[in-house]
């Protein structure tokens, strides 16, 4: 199993690469790419960690040497948020980066599963889909927007509030991956109940958690370490499913039946070909239903922005 990380010299990429080097199954290959000249050195640094995961680093304008034979491609390349920016402010720079990298994926490893971490995910996934479609290699079961950070934050914040072990929780989060489009389904956590105020406050905290980190880092970065962990969780789940493990479930932002939007984050059963099943989002509380209805306009606009970037 070969995993390629594109954007591997950045804050998220390095954390992700470290976790993959220590946790990928024995015999896996890990390929690191970034435009930054430091990238081969990051690979050398990680190569000293005693695990049976082969690692190699590539830098420069061309990502294709890193992509040959990749089964999974995780893309975290791009600029990070600064105070006062929201994820959509990143669009102008990151849209072009994602387009260029996906063009190289389309020609080099068109059958790979692709996880997009680069924000704004609501839009960059649509960009990736349109590029792959133009290249004639789009498979909607193999393209994912990585929203796992919303899930791990939900698990953490609910555990803190309710005195639970975070490892025991798995809060489904649906919608998208920015602001109001992030919708944790707090009503679906077995054995945990909330007051209306707790639901409103928790939902808002989960939606704004990225800003909490950006502000706490005082201009020195965004959520890189927790995002690295979230991306590793998703990447490792995908690898397990591709290798035949049954019943692997993760939430991610994928193209589905279009009931709510062309792309929508929901719980997925992963399998040997990527998405095996898009699970139903279940029964929502009145609060959740209203939040879902209210976000769709924003989500549709985010998606349209990505489609137009490629098609106009």
Swiss-Prot record:
Catalytic activity: (S)-malate + NAD(+) = oxaloacetate + NADH + H(+)
Catalytic residues identified in the record: 177 (proton acceptor)
Example of a GO cellular component annotation carried by this entry: cytoplasm
One MF annotation (Gene Ontology) recorded for this entry: L-malate dehydrogenase (NAD+) activity
Residues that hold NAD(+) according to the record: 7-13, 34, 94, 117-119, 227
GO BP annotations listed: carboxylic acid metabolic process; tricarboxylic acid cycle
Keywords carried by this UniProt record: NAD, Oxidoreductase, Tricarboxylic acid cycle
Enzyme Commission number(s): 1.1.1.37
Regions that span the bilayer: none
Binding site residues for substrate: 81, 87, 119, 153
Class of the enzyme per the UniProt entry, highest EC level: oxidoreductase
A Pfam short name: Ldh_1_C
PANTHER family in the cross-refs: MALATE AND LACTATE DEHYDROGENASE (PTHR11540), MALATE DEHYDROGENASE, MITOCHONDRIAL (PTHR11540:SF16)
Quaternary context: Homodimer.
HAMAP family recorded: Malate_dehydrog_1
Chain's role: Catalyzes the reversible oxidation of malate to oxaloacetate.
Family designation: Belongs to the LDH/MDH superfamily. MDH type 1 family.
Protein name: Malate dehydrogenase
Native source species: Serratia proteamaculans (strain 568)
Gene designation per UniProt: mdh
